[in-house]
Amino acid sequence: MISAGVDSKDLAKRGESLIRQSTNRYLTTVKIAFRAKQRRFDDFDGLLEESSVKPVHRAIVELSDEQDQPDLLPG
């Protein structure tokens, strides 16, 4: 999913896309922060192997992927 290094330009484009396609910028920012917090605690619990990527970067990539490819979501 996420390589060891996340390209900063790609990350910026993904973040801009999330904000641009949202109806509420504040809620999108809160969603990113909440997801990053979850990932940080998952790192502490040892549930995630990819600790080289910052949680906020991982959150932006995950939310962007969910937005762009909704067929990846379970259910």
Swiss-Prot record:
Query: Is-annotated flag, keyword Transferase?
Result: yes
Q: Which GO terms describe its biological process?
A: DNA-templated transcription
By sequence similarity, the record places it as follows: Belongs to the RNA polymerase subunit omega family.
EC identifiers of the protein: 2.7.7.6
* Reactions that this protein is recorded to catalyse: RNA(n) + a ribonucleoside 5'-triphosphate = RNA(n+1) + diphosphate
| Species in which this protein is naturally found | Synechococcus sp. (strain CC9311)
Assembly mode: In cyanobacteria the RNAP catalytic core is composed of 2 alpha, 1 beta, 1 beta', 1 gamma and 1 omega subunit. When a sigma factor is associated with the core the holoenzyme is formed, which can initiate transcription.
Gene Ontology MF: a single term: DNA binding
Q: What does this protein do?
A: Promotes RNA polymerase assembly. Latches the N- and C-terminal regions of the beta' subunit thereby facilitating its interaction with the beta and alpha subunits.
What UniProt keywords apply to this chain's record, in alphabetical order? Answer: DNA-directed RNA polymerase, Nucleotidyltransferase, Transcription, Transferase
* GO CC list: DNA-directed RNA polymerase complex
Asked whether the UniProt record includes Transcription among its keywords, one would answer yes
Native organism taxonomy: Bacteria, Bacillati, Cyanobacteriota, Cyanophyceae, Synechococcales
Give the protein name, as stated in the record: DNA-directed RNA polymerase subunit omega
